[in-house]
A protein has these predicted regions:
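Active-site neighborhood of divalent metal-dependent phosphoester bond hydrolases
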Residues: 46-117, 124, 130-150
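Divalent metal-coordination and catalytic microenvironments
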Residues: 10, 38, 53, 64-65, ...
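Active-site environment of divalent metal-dependent phosphoester hydrolases
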Residues: 12-17, 41-43, 67-71, 110, ...
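Acidic, His/Gly-rich catalytic cores of divalent-metal-dependent hydrolytic chemistry
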Residues: 126, 133-215
Length: 215
């Protein structure tokens, strides 16, 4: 079987569901996994997810807003964590020196050739080198508040050269725009963990084993 690139939605510590998904797609030695970010917080196994991505070169991820929050906190910035981030911070902070180098290394964007991977979004009409880290980790809509769920979705307007694979904004099914596909289908909220296989254009998903977060 030819090697495949499997892009998965927000994990949020849902390690068991990731294993279920990899079993479903018959993940092989020559395949790779790219996550759209938010490896950590909210779910039960952030440590296991981080350990996997740090130890196996087949796994990579872009920076999500929750990953960024822990990175900033553990690097000594005086930021206030969200309630949903505090349990993971408390559980892992004694080992933060082990995880900080990896979190520091996460890129905000990965170019897969035919596709781009980013956590939240890209602002239409803005060159890649001019996209802000805030937009790449927080963007939902094109109104005054980038994080708003009520404004015009960025992916309805985006029409770049490459298809963007993103997460951050959970929905029951993958969000599909002109040149963008959203893969956060709310696993941590009891819904599904979804993936897109670059080479075949297939969507795959598995159900959450339980509801981990109600926020």
């Amino acid at each position: 079987m030819a090697s495949r690139t499997i892009v998965v939605g927000d994990l949020h510590g849902c390690y068991d569901e990731l294993m279920d998904l990899l079993n479903q797609v018959a993940f092989g030695a020559d395949d790779r996994v790219v996550c759209v970010g938010d490896l950590v917080t909210k779910g039960p196994k952030s440590r296991e997810v981080l350990d996997l991505f740090m130890s196996d070169q087949r796994f990579s991820s872009v920076m999500g807003n929750h990953d960024l929050a822990l990175r900033r906190k553990w690097n000594g910035e005086k930021i206030k964590l969200k309630e949903s981030q505090k349990p993971t911070h408390k559980a892992l902070k004694k080992d933060k020196q082990h995880y900080v180098p990896y979190l520091n290394s996460l890129p905000f964007l990965i170019d897969l050739g035919s596709h781009l991977v980013v956590h939240a979004g890209l602002r239409p009409g803005v060159e890649l080198h001019s996209q802000t880290t805030e937009d790449m980790t927080e963007l939902r809509s094109l109104g005054k508040d980038r994080a708003s769920r009520n404004g015009p979705p960025w992916y309805d307007e985006y029409d770049g050269d490459k298809v963007v694979l993103f997460g951050h904004w959970p929905a029951p099914e993958p969000r599909v725009g002109k040149k963008a596909i959203g893969l956060d289908t709310g696993c941590v909220y009891g819904h599904r963990l979804s993936a897109f296989i670059i080479e075949t254009g297939e969507f795959k998903s598995v159900p959450a084993r339980e509801t981990y977060d109600l926020t």
